[in-house]
Amino acid sequence: MRKPFATMFVLACSLGLLAGCQTHRAAPAPAVMPATSIELRTPRPGLYTAGQPAADDWAAIAAGGVGTVIDLRAPGELKDRDEAAEVRAAGLRYVSIPVAGAGGIDDANAKALRAALDAADGPVLVHCASGNRVGGLLALMQARSGTMTPEQALEFGRSAGMASTEARVRELLVAPEGRCIAQTGGSVRPEGCP
């Protein structure tokens, strides 16, 4: 009597494991990024940052596995080119989050960048003219999320291209409200925090 029960139990467990395998999607093998006219930084796997790619870079970027391009340039910065059309012609998804200089590095744009990154399916390229705004906005986003300390977020931003925008990010992180958010990840506020 025990043997049929044990056999049925093992069979049921095996079928359960096999059913679970059907829904598991294997992660794509990492692609080697072909050469482009610009330096592509990789502050973390699946996230590329850069200055302005040339029109003929999009095919190489797509071949390297990127699926989404997030452009932080403000309207009018890129004259005589339709970047959205170029990106889409290469088979990539295009997202525009206009960040006008260091002053455009703010909480609203950090939230917009977080939403765009979360919505992306696969590797992402985030760019501006030089990578400076990209690194600054990524640093602010990471500090505000509470996943990194402010210093870790600043280091992450530097690895993504932040240079002169670091002063703006530091200003936001040391302001009373910014300090409170960075310390708590936006959850319970310590005494004295708004």
What are these regions (language model features)?
Residues M1-F9:
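Bacterial N-terminal signal peptides that target proteins for export
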Residues C21-V124, A139-P194:
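Cys-dependent protein tyrosine phosphatase-like superfamily
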Residues L125-G135:
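A phosphate-binding catalytic loop at a beta-strand-loop-alpha-helix junction
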Residues M8-A19:
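Bacterial N-terminal signal peptides
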